[in-house]
Structures are given as structure tokens and as C-alpha cells.
Amino acid sequence: MAASSLEQKLSRLEAKLKQENREARRRIDLNLDISPQRPRPTLQLPLANDGGSRSPSSESSPQHPTPPSRPRHMLGLPSTLFTPRSMESIEIDQKLQEIMKQTGYLTIGGQRYQAEINDLENLGEMGSGTCGQVWKMRFRKTGHIIAVKQMRRSGNKEENKRILMDLDVVLKSHDCPYIVQCFGTFITNTDVFIAMELMGTCAEKLKKRMQGPIPERILGKMTVAIVKALYYLKEKHGVIHRDVKPSNILLDERGQIKLCDFGISGRLVDSKAKTRSAGCAAYMAPERIDPPDPTKPDYDIRADVWSLGISLVELATGQFPYKNCKTDFEVLTKVLQEEPPLLPGHMGFSGDFQSFVKDCLTKDHRKRPKYNKLLEHSFIKHYETLEVDVASWFKDVMAKTESPRTSGVLSQHHLPFFR
């Protein structure tokens, strides 16, 4: 591709990034607006503490509030119009109606409880993202502490699609130990609430806490969990995640490692994704940035394999591999024009780990392995059977390091919707 043509393509992608960022800021502002002019849902959730302090332990969740060191924005790409818009809107409404029939219950520890939103005690905000906010809450009937993702029902088709996709995937994935579990949902006229298991923190925040690399033995167990989660999504539900990155990988003090955030996942048709909407530019595979055949911009699960490879390099080295980039334009250009990142030889990584990452970051997607091949790799086989005390390592890191600071945190006196 000629340089001028490439620059034009990347400039268009960057323009779409900026547009998406404006939309994201608008959605967050909508959620955080506490002015009297905006009607409020009639939710009365008493706060655990009226002192205005945030719960110190509420750090992680299916959403992730701490911004990474370099802004990594959601990239909105042109979508192929294979479904009539009106039919798609009808399908969204039908799926929402189906899910609404299942609301009003929480299933925790194998027990099903009838519940409503007022049965939850708000312990404070855990974070906010493009879709809304996540709250730490206590289920009064049992005392269980859970994470509750709140998303506004704005009427915007794309936002509703994200809500539905996230709901659909987590509700169906109850039998996968490597995907964050959903306890139930509550739907009001203005909001959708998804009750999730409370995890400790995400890999992105762990990297920030440690201010350096995560050990290979931990990344080995993490790789096994994430590859199996992605393989499960593809084989069981025909879904591609499309947003694999450290902030969507959760860990907890029990040593569990799970994948989360399925709002921009896509359905696979003949094993290929037919839409190009959404994704994080920093982890996007070359074939998604610049499709080999622009008239058929299909891609498959190997795009997520690339994202996993970039994530592993970042976590293993403590640095994002495409350094010194001030804009997403620069990152996208480097992904297309430079050789793929590798694990540096001087940091003591095993040959199996280096080989696995190299396979994931094969630039030609046709030669990049799929999940079934990755599961046969000696790196995966080794860490499938090796005993690693992830729980003790996790608790040690959390005890000896400080939580990454977040800006613009609201005190409990200003938690919207829960007065």
C-alpha cells in the first residue's frame, strides 16, 4: 500500500477514534450528571457509610476505572451493512424482552433468591467506563459482597447492542470457570444492572501496582485461563471477544483468573466476524487495521490471539511494546510497518514462553495459530499441570503495593442514582 494511501486510512481511523471518545465522554457525563434538571430513577439504596469515604478495597470489577499510562481508546471501525437496521432494532428489543423475563433473581452459591434493586446496599463506586459504572454492593439477604455493573438504557442502538451482548455472553457462560460469573440482572426503565462476582483486580492494575513485570509462572497460568475462555466462547457460543487486553483479565485472592467485559464481542458467521465495529487500537491485529481485501473485511479469532500476544509482552516486560507513541495513529502505523514485538532475550524468559508469544504475534494472520493449536503448545501444556500458588502471590502483591490512583473519584455523598 502506498504511503499516502496508508496515511489516509490511518487518519480516517484516528478520526473515528476521536469521535468515539467524544461519545464515550458524553455517556460518562450523562451517568455522572447529578443536576436536578435530569430525571432520576426512583432507586433508594442506602449507603454503607455516610462519612463520604470510598471503600478502600473496591478496586476491581468487570469494568476498570484506572486509565493506562498512554490513552488507549476504543476504536470504532466502519461496519458492514449485512443486516437491515430496522430488523436489527427489532432483534435488540426482542432479546431485551427475553432477558427481562429472567430479572428479579440472584443465583449465588447454587441458591436462587428473589430480589429487587433495593435489596442491594451500595458500598461505593468501583469505577466507570464507556458503558457506565460499577458499584461494590452487599446483598442484604445473604451478606454476599458483589460487583454490580450499571448501564444506562439510552435508546441508542449501539449502546443497547453492547448491553445485550455483555448480558447474553455472561448469562450463557455460567459453566465456564474462566469467565466472570453473572448472578442475575435488574432492568428498570432507565438502567440495566448486572450483578457479577467480585474479583480482586485486573492485570493492568497489577502491572501498575508492581511498577514492573509480572512473573512468567503467573502469566503461564493466566495464559491457560484466557486461551481456554476464548476457546470456550468460540466453540460453545460462536463468539469472538474482540477486546482482549490486560484490563479485561481479572484475578482474585483465591487464585482465580477470569476474562470479562463482552460488550463489544461479535457473533461469528462461518467462523468469521462480519462486523468491524469497536476494539482497542493498542491491541488491534494488523488484519483488522488494514484488511488484506477491503471489499471483504472479515477476520477470525486469530485477531484475539494477536491481542493476547501484545498483552503478554506488556505484562511480562512491564511496558507496552509500542513505546514512545503519543497518538493512536503512531501505534497503528507501527503495528502495520514494524516487525512484531518479541520477548527480550535478556530477561530470562523460558524458550517455551518466547515461542508461544512469537506464535501469537505472527503478522500474517493466515499463519497465526488458532486456539486448538495454541492449546497444544508446550507452554500451555506445561502450565496446565504445573502447580503455581497464584493466590499467595496475589495476596502478597496486594498487601505490599499501593493501589493505582484514580482521578475524579466521587465520594459516597455524590453517588448518582443511589440516594
Swiss-Prot record:
CDD domains: PKc_MKK7 (cd06618). Activated by phosphorylation on Ser-271 and Thr-275 by MAP kinase kinase kinases (MAP3Ks). InterPro entries: Dual_spec_MAPK_kinase (IPR052468), Kinase-like_dom_sf (IPR011009), Prot_kinase_dom (IPR000719), Ser/Thr_kinase_AS (IPR008271). Keywords: Acetylation, Apoptosis, ATP-binding, Coiled coil, Cytoplasm, Kinase, Magnesium, Metal-binding, Nucleotide-binding, Nucleus, Phosphoprotein, Serine/threonine-protein kinase, Stress response, Transferase, Tyrosine-protein kinase. Residues 120-380 form the Protein kinase domain. Residues 18-77 are annotated as: Disordered. The record marks Q44, L45, G76, L77 as: Cleavage. One of its GO terms (cellular component) is cytoplasm. Residues 18-30 have a biased composition (Basic and acidic residues). The active site is at D243 (proton acceptor). Residues 36-63 have a biased composition (Low complexity). It catalyses: L-seryl-[protein] + ATP = O-phospho-L-seryl-[protein] + ADP + H(+); L-threonyl-[protein] + ATP = O-phospho-L-threonyl-[protein] + ADP + H(+); L-tyrosyl-[protein] + ATP = O-phospho-L-tyrosyl-[protein] + ADP + H(+). Residues 377-400 are annotated as: DVD domain. It holds the Pfam family Pkinase. Signal peptide: none annotated. Activated by phosphorylation by specific MAP kinase kinase kinases such as MAP3K1/MEKK1, MAP3K3/MEKK3, MAP3K11/MLK3 and MAP3K12/DLK. Belongs to the protein kinase superfamily. STE Ser/Thr protein kinase family. MAP kinase kinase subfamily. The DVD domain (residues 377-400) contains a conserved docking site and is found in the mammalian MAP kinase kinases (MAP2Ks). The DVD sites bind to their specific upstream MAP kinase kinase kinases (MAP3Ks) and are essential for activation. The D domain (residues 37-57) contains a conserved docking site and is required for the binding to MAPK substrates. This is Dual specificity mitogen-activated protein kinase kinase 7. It comes from Rattus norvegicus. The gene is Map2k7.
